[in-house]
Each structure stands twice: as structure tokens, then as C-alpha cells.
Amino acid sequence: MAKDGRPSNLPLLYNPLLNCIFNNPNHSRAPYKQIIHELASRHTDFTIIVPPSSLLHNSYDPESLKSSSKIALHDLAYHNEEFIRSHIVKTGSNSHAFLAPVAKVQSAIYNTICGKQILVKNGMIFTGKGFRRSLRAKITDIGYFDSFCDYFPSGSKFMLIYIDNSLYGSSDHPEPALEASPKAQQAKIKRPDQVPTESITFERLLRNFPLLSKSVSDPFYQLFHHNNYQFRVLRTNTHKKLSVIKSEFDNMLEEAYQIISNSVKSDSPDGEQTNNLLHQILRSYPELDLNKLVHEYVEINLYDKLWAQLIFQFSANAGLADPDATKIFTAEKYDELSCLSLNQLDIPVDEPWLLNDLLLRVYNAIIELSKLADATIIESSSKLKIISNTISILTENSNSSLMIDADTLIGLLIMVVVHSKIDFIEAHLYYIKNFMYGTISDDGYLSFIISSFDAVFFHLSHPDEPQYADMKESSQKNFEFWSLIRSHKVDEITALLEETDKLYGDKLPHNHFLKARNINGESALMLAIRSKNYDTFLLLLSRNPNWFSIEDILFDRNTTTSQNLLMVSLMEETKIITKILIEILGSCTLEEQIAYINSTDYSGRSVGHYLFHDYELINEVGHLVNWELKDHNSYTPLFNICRCYDHYAYYDLIKTAFSAVMSPNFNFKKHTDKYGNSILHILLKGIDQSGLLKADKNINVNCTNSKCLTPLTVYVKYGRIENLISLLQDKRLEFMFEDKKNFFNIFDYVAFSSRKQGDNDRGNSEEITSFIYSHYFKHFIPLKCTTVAFNAKFDTTKKDWIVYFHGNQNIILGLDSIKQSHHSFKLKNPHSLIPDVEKVWLNYPANGSVAPIFAKFRMNRLLENLNIFLVCLSMHPNFDTAPHETLGLSSSGNSSSLDQMKEVIGKQESSSKVTPHQLAEIETFLSLSKENLLGTLSTTIKFNKLMTVMNIKMGDLNTIREDSLYSAKMLCDMTPSIKTNYHTPDYGYRTMFQYFIWVELTLIEIIRNVNKVLGRITDWRQCHDRVLSLAGELRKYEDKRHELGTDEHSNSSWFGNIIENKRTRYKKLVLLHSEETKKLGLLSNEIKISHEDIAAEMSHYLMFRSKLIPFAIKQFTRVATTGLNRNGLHVLQ
């Protein structure tokens, strides 16, 4: 023993709690004795809560941190009975669990074996009554632990729930209390001074302070009432000067201020209290301007009337009462300038990349300014904020070195106003200048904003000015030229270009319509592509090559979508134009080509994302594409290509794309979308053409998406037969993979798919089902096992699991019926090496309840156990033809248990004699066989323990390696992956153990039968001795009978009584001798039949073992090699 009490002579398990329970040499001593006894007696009624191994090794009990000596959690796990009992939960049928009434919510309250309570709900465990603190721990995994110790039943499995913390908490993983105290809750409530000043309005003050509302509500109601004759001017639609409207508003504002003043006068009701209240508010918010709040309150209540008056005045151009109410931007003017381009406004920007920047600013500014037309914008401050934001968008310098001067700003603002097409924009500006709180002239920036808009209005208010005429003419020329492109009028375009060439030659003016771009930033070249006008596109490029420089072409893009010419050409599928653009791109440097191809649009997509429109282009530009670049949906170009399910040449598309992508540096994980789908998940067909499965590394064929679907389950779910066939042949495939969320396996998805398929898809579904079942029978089941269990569901009416069998016969049976058939078989064949029902179903007792999260997982293991049972039956010589009949899986009915017992008894009562010599031979044979079987059993038990421990230690090794990598990343200031606490996976040893345990169970069964017969032999000898003794006594009576024969008719009464007593004694001896002789005959018959049966079963055992062990090794090799292939270790030399 080590100093700390832990065993030093056994292979320690890395998790201290599991090591204490399953690998404890002191299990028969306190404090472990009672715990071990409870677990051993009803191991299926308990579930062990397992904290992370690293946490137990490296953390302390939080309660001990305040004391002078800290207590490590691993010491509690080894020595503290309460800690151990607190992590063992009663989940059996007698655990008194309170389940949630809603089935979708997996929640239940359970008691630990020390009387504490936990709540299991929605993947979390919450500590409750009895625990020192209210904590919560996340459930990270569940599983079964195969026991290998001698003090638990052989082959027993214990349910484990893995969590991310201990139920005592830990020093490295602090958890807050579930419910805050009332004081803490009160502290979270915002105090008045925490309310932002900007969010305070006068209306809010009225709601929050009833005293203030009581003082001013009635006067304000009268002020804003429609019958208020004093301000009737605002309610009559007559032509009037704008100053009159402004004056009426000012008067109402003064009335509002007076209402506030009157409310705080000492002679008014509650005046003093109202005054004190307002002073208290102002002290709490020193930055609050009460006059501003009142102004905004009046403005909100009068907005509808004010705005209606302004609209009426600005609409009456024929009978204007005020020159300031002139409507400049009419619908006609907007139409006249609708095609105006930025290059035609004397903006000193020639570089195409800077022009793109300005066009994008204009587009964003148009969106912002268009908010003025929103009917919910009813305050001058909101309107001012909109035009202020518009100016800020145009002048921002965050991503550009371009400086915007005043003249440039006016030009940009003209574009914004003209293309936003806001009706009555003049009224909006007038409202801002005349109805806002304060004076604009006091703020220099606001004055600059307003003056900028005034300048735009001035420039566009004089249609007779040459500047406006030029803009109108330019807009008209743009419209006519773009219309020619869209209508494919090549002859007219040719004549127009010839005329332009004669007029300007190589040097086009900056404001020429050939260089014009619409509000989306689309040039004539872009419009030609959009309209699929190849002739015009070629004509524009070839008429005079000096008109469009290489920079003009490379930076020609739709500024709203950021799509360049090549992207649009691919989208429009204009292959000839695409080819021309590729030729032009070939004249650039390699760096320029890569930058152009991988520049992204508004959705984050590059040219590579659109190559599926012309997949032959991949061979030319594939080497330039960044295939790992993700768009906003996390699609890489390769991922996007694979999703083109309706492509006319999908196979060629996939083959071409993967031939360009696949290389030794190909990273499979990079091509995953935000839902966790890999390329294998979304590939419709052509998996062989892709060559993905031929890659030696980086390909995880078992990866799951956010819905816990693997590529295999996706192919089954969506009927992708071609991919399914190819994937089933891959050595890395985990065919029986179960997701960690619902524990569905491939057979569940086959069942789901079969139920969802309609009549048209039924043939496809049946074909998929056939492939899945055939693969399972080929790789997981021996040839002679023709029927296995695939699915099950719980029947609430029968309170039993209904099992679905598939094979030569498709049968549905209840689990209880299967167990009864097994029991009947054992009654009929008491000496069969097939174990008893209790041994086979040791871990799955009848009516055994488990935690809700364990239900599906436990059912999967039960089906697994049932199939292994069927496999073992198929390897028994007596069941070569139909092993499934043993469990009642045949069409013929089984006889009852009573009939089976009568048949066995009748067989045993048949006459048969065994001589002592024969008996000695039988005894010698059985004794020698028992000795050999015990030696084999001892070796088998050791081997099974080794298999179990080996699988656990492999998991421990992997856990230690992950913990080491986590610590190393923390030391290197890297972002480590989240530490996990998962169930030990199967490294192949668990699979081998599941079959080798049957060798152990059959040996135990044969030895038990041998011991039973040896006991019968002892009974036979004792009975034989009694028969000989009784026969000797009978001979003595018969000899004395002749001596007493002469006195038989004596009249002496006393002498006659003696003779009568001897006769009675003689009769009793005869009867006793007859009974013992009959019993001896039965024993002889039973021993002979049992001997023959056991001898046959020993022969069957040798044949059974010779078949089972190679099959078990084959399954071990399959699981182990699958893991090696999955991890890429098969390439190591």
C-alpha cells in the first residue's frame, strides 16, 4: 500500500472515484464495505456521477480553502464515505424518482445513497437537499463501465454519468449559487441616476411621477385639444406664410412653458410639492434640460398639424403665399436627373478605386437620407440626426485616404438628394431649421450641415443655369446609351462609338457617358454583361483600347454588391465574355490576379464561389483561388460547388473542382459551414469522382454536424445511394456510430427514412435498407446467424420494449417474450452450455428503470447484448440451422414451460441402469474435465479482466494526453479547446470482451452442470449404500421367518404379537427398499443422461470456442483498424 492508502499493486485507474469503487483492495473494510455491498447486490439500480479526472487530481474542496489545511478532491474520492455516496444515485425502480410530466423535458429528481437529492434536467445536474451548496454541473457524456473486479458480479455493467465538475464543487471551477439572495436581487435594480439622460422625455416624467402629471396634464390637454380656438390657424388649410406657422408654434410653446411655471407657484394646488419634485429631478440629472423636454413634448403633440400645414404650403406652387415655400424637387426634376453619374459633377477623382469608394458612400448616404420619408420620424432632432448621419457617411475617412473638400461634398450631396427622391425634402429642411430646440447658428457643425443642403437646393433650383443644363443633358445621354445597351441595338451603339472616336480620339473627357456609372456603380461594361450583350461588350473594348485601362476593368464593380465584372459574367453565364476577361486578367501580375480572383463581394464570396457557373474555367484559374476562403454562410468555394445539386454536369463539376483542390496540404476541416456540415455531408453524388475517400489523412468520414448527423446518416436520410455505397467500403467508417445527443444509430435513421418516404420513393428506401442490412450482416454477424435485432420501441400499454428483428424472418417480439423463450429453452435443455436467463440479462433486468437520459443508450446496449446472444447461439453446433428459434423468433409456436418440464421429467424417468464401475468412470471423467475447465476458466477470467482494464487504460492515456496539451496551450498563451469529460470509447478491447465473456459464462455453466452431476453421483452412492443395507436387513428377516414357521399357529397371544410386529417391520423395509431402488434408478438415469449431455456440451463447447474466438478477434481487428485508419496511423511505418 502507498502512504496515502491507494493501492500500489494494481493497475490504477486515472479517475480516483472509479478507482476507489472498482479497483479497491480494501473493499471489505470501512468506509467502503457497505457501499460495495449495496452496489454488488443491485448494481442496475444505481448510477455513478463521475467528475473529471483532472479536476479530482488537481483541485481542492472549496469548503477547505478557508481553513489552514486544504483538502484535495482526490483524497475525498479515496477516503471520504460521504463524498463517494454523494456521487452514487439511486435510479432503479425503487428509487422514488419524481419524473417530469412533459416527456420532452428530460428531468427527474433522484436521491443519492446517502439521502441527498439531485435534479437531472436538460443535460444538467443541479444539487439540492442535503448538499452544502446549490451547484450545477453540465452532463458531458454517459456510458457503461465494465467491471473487472472480483467483488462485483462477473460481466456486470455500471451506469455512469460524466459531468464537468464535482457535486462538491472545486477550487478551479467555482459555481455561483442558483438563486441570488433578495439583497443581491435588489442591488441589480437600476437606481434613478443610472438611467441615461438621453432616454428621459417629458412624457416619461409624467408617467413616473404622478404628482407632476396631476399638476400639468389637464392644462396640456386643453392646450392640445382640437377645440382650442386660440390656435385655430394650425388647423385651417389656407395659404399663409411659413412664418405664421412658426409663430403659432412659438406661441403654443410659450403657453406650455407657462403651464410648467404655474404648476410650481405657491398659490397653486400642490405647487410646493411639484417645485420640490422638479428640483429633485434636476439634482439627480444635472445635465437635464427641462425646457428642451417641454419643447419636444409640444413638438410631438403638434407634429401632425405642423407637417400638414407645411405640405399644404409647399404644394401650392401656383398660388404661393411665401417664396420660401417653393417646391424645388418635383417628380419631373427627379426624372430629369435620374441617370446622373458621379463623374459628371466635377468631382476631382480619376482613380477607379477611389471612385468606387465615393459611389459606395453615396449609396449608403441615400439609404440614410431616405429615412426622412419614414412616417415615424416626427421630431426635428430625429430629422437632424438623419441629415447629420448622411453628411458623416459622405465625409468619413475610416477606410480611405481620400479627403472630401466642400466642393466635392456638394457634388456627392447632389447625387444623394437626386437619387433618394424624397418628396417635400424642402419641407423637411425647413422643419429642422425652424422647429428644432435651440439655434443652429450656435453650433458650427450643424450650420455646416444645413448650409451644405442649402447649397444643393440652390444649385438645383435654377433650371436655366448652364450647370443644371449640363447635368440634365448628361443624365439624358446616360439614359439613352444605357437603353441602347439593354435593347441590344449594336448598330446604333457602333455609330455612336465611331462618332465619339472621331470627336475625342484616345482621350475621353472625364465626364463622358462612356465613363458614366449608375447609382449602383455599374459601368457600360457591366451593363453589357448584365444584358448578355456580347457584341456591345467586345465593341466597347475593341473600338479604342485606350478608353478603358486595365485598372478601369479590374476595379469595375457594382459598388452595392461589390461584385466585379468576372463575378457578374459568371453569374450571367456569358462564357464568351468570361473568356475575354480571363485573357485580360492574364496580362496582370500574379499578385494582381490572385487579389482580383479572391476579392469578395457583399456576401463574402469570391470568384471561386461562382465558378460552378462555368466549371471548365476551374482548370485555368483554380490555382489562383483561395479555396479555404469562407463567405458569410461559412461556405468555401469548394463547399459552394458541392451544393450545386441541380447542375447539369454535376459529376464533371465535382471531378474538376477536386482535381484543382486536392493536394498534400488539403485541410478537410477548413471546408465546414456554420452548421458543422462537411463536404462529405453536402456532397450529393460523385464521391468517387471527388477522390475524397482516397486521401490518406485529414478526412474524417465520421464527423458530425450541429444536428449530430454523420455523412453516413445524411446519405440514408436523403437517399444518396451512390455515396452510401462508396462510404460503406471505407475502412475509416464507424458504421455503428451513435450521436452523443440522442444516441441514434444508423438503424434508427433507416427506420426514420422508411417511415417518411412516399410511394414514389419506396423503392429507393428499400434499396438503402438492403445496403445497410447487408453491410451489417457481412461485417458484424457470422454467416449462420440469419436474424438479428435492429430497432426497438417502448410500448406504453404493455409496459414492455418491442424488438424488431430483421433477416430471413422479419419478426416483432416483446422483450419479456424473448426472456420467457430463453427460460423455456433452459428448462428443456438444463445441461446446455447456454447460460441462464439471469446471466444473459444480468445488466437488463425486467422492469428495470433508468434515468431518462439513459433510456435510448440502454436500449442500444440491450439490442447489442441480444445480437451477441444470437451470434453465440449460431456458433453452437445444435443451432447451426436456426439459432433464432431458441428465442422464439421462428414462425412455429413454442411449448409452455410446464410442457417443457414434463418432457424433461419423462425423459429422466425412462429406465436405465448404471453400475458402480460405470459410475466411477463417469466420476473420473467429470472430475478430470472439471479440473481442466477450472484451469481454462481461470485463464479466461484473467484475459477478460485484461481486456477490460486495457480499454480503460487506453482511455486514461488519451485523457492524460489531452490534459497535457491543454496545459501546454495555456502556458503558451494559446486558446485551448474546452476540456471535456467523456466516456472511454471502444478501442477494440471492449468488443473482444463482449464475446470472450461468453466463453467465461459458458465455462461457468458447464462447471455448474458438472458439479451438479458430481453431487448426484454422491447422492447415488449414498442411495446405493442404503439399498444394500436394506437388502441385508430383508435377508435377515427372511431367514428368521423360516425358523418361526413351526410356531406360526401358536395360540400364545404375546408370542403372536411379536410375530405381528416383525411382519409390520418387514413390510416397511420392503416399501423403503422399493422406494430407494426406484430413487436409485432415477439417479442412475439422470446421471447417465446428464453425463451424455455434458459430454456432448463439452464437445460443443470446443466447437463453439473454436468459432467464437476467431470471430471475436476479427471484430477486435475491425474496431482497432477502423480507429487506426481514422487517425491516419496506418500510414506510419
Swiss-Prot record:
It holds the Pfam family VPS9. Residues 324-469 form the VPS9 domain. GO terms for molecular function: guanyl-nucleotide exchange factor activity; SNARE binding. Gene3D superfamilies: Ankyrin repeat-containing domain, VPS9 domain. InterPro entries: Ankyrin_rpt-contain_sf, UPF0507/Ank_repeat_27, VPS9, VPS9_dom_sf. Belongs to the UPF0507 family. PANTHER family: ANKYRIN REPEAT DOMAIN-CONTAINING PROTEIN 27 (PTHR24170), DOMAIN PROTEIN, PUTATIVE (AFU_ORTHOLOGUE AFUA_1G09870)-RELATED (PTHR24170:SF1). This is UPF0507 protein PGUG_02975.
